[in-house]
Amino acid sequence: GGGGGSGETSGMWFGPRL
């Protein structure tokens, strides 16, 4: 959803912020 990362859920990022 934002910030980058390997995936997204409920509009929130999760995973490494690359």
Swiss-Prot record:
Disulphide bonds in the chain: none
GO cellular-component term (any): extracellular region
This protein's record includes keyword Plastid: no
Origin superkingdom: Eukaryota
Residue numbers carrying Leucine amide: 18
Subcellular location, record wording: Secreted
GO molecular function, one term: neuropeptide hormone activity
Keyword vocabulary terms for this entry: Amidation, Neuropeptide, Secreted
Statement: the UniProt record of this protein carries the keyword Secreted: yes
GO biological process, one term: neuropeptide signaling pathway
Function of the molecule: Myoactive.
Family under the similarity heading: Belongs to the pyrokinin family.
Protein name stated in the entry: Pyrokinin-5
